[in-house]
Regions:
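Receiver (REC) domain active-site loop signature in two-component systems and cognate sites
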Residues: 63
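Acidic, metal-coordinating helix/loop segments flanking the phosphotransfer/catalytic sites
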Residues: 19, 35-56, 77
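Receiver (REC) domain switch/active-site region of two-component response regulators
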Residues: 113
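Two-component/phosphorelay signaling modules centered on CheY-like receiver
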Residues: 12-34
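Alpha4 helix (beta4-alpha4-beta5 surface) of REC/receiver domains from two-component response regulators
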Residues: 70, 91-108, 116-119
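Short amphipathic alpha-helix used as the core "switch/output" element in two-component signaling
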Residues: 41-47, 69-81, 101
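Receiver (REC) domain switch/output surface
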Residues: 117-129
């Protein structure tokens, strides 16, 4: 059964990297990857009735406009059950604390350990259903 993952990042290279690192899972039908370049675009994507349903959001923190922490707060207000993993090159304690307060499921620092990330995604209750 396929599930959708929404990746939010304003850097095209990062989007390409996620596409490459999840290529096998996409071919196997495990994950359908969706991408948004901003927090506003991510909220628009979440409002759509995407099938298969989005079961997790992976969001960069440092983005112009609505940053990843603001996006996290908005998502948690609208869909408190949706796991959001923040992804950032800045792993400082303040960002980590703020992400946790806002309800982040996981705080991931770059460079991303994709094997670990895939394992975390497999552990999501909605991904196994």
């Amino acid at each position: 059964m396929s599930v959708s993952i929404l990746v939010v990042d304003d850097e095209p290279d990062v989007v390409d990297l996620f596409g490459q690192r999840f290529r096998r899972e996409a071919r196997q039908g495990t994950y359908v990857m969706h991408f948004a370049a901003s927090g506003v675009e991510a909220l628009d994507r979440l409002a759509e009735k995407i099938q298969p349903a989005i079961v997790a959001v992976l969001s960069d923190i440092n983005m112009p406009g609505t940053d990843g922490l603001e996006l996290l707060g908005e998502i948690k207000q609208r869909r408190p059950d949706l796991p959001v993993m923040t992804v950032t090159a800045y792993g400082d304690d303040e960002r980590r604390r703020r992400a946790r307060e806002l309800g982040a499921f996981e705080f991931i620092t770059k460079p991303v350990d994709f094997d670990r990330l895939k394992e975390q995604l497999r552990q999501l209750p909605t991904a196994a259903d």
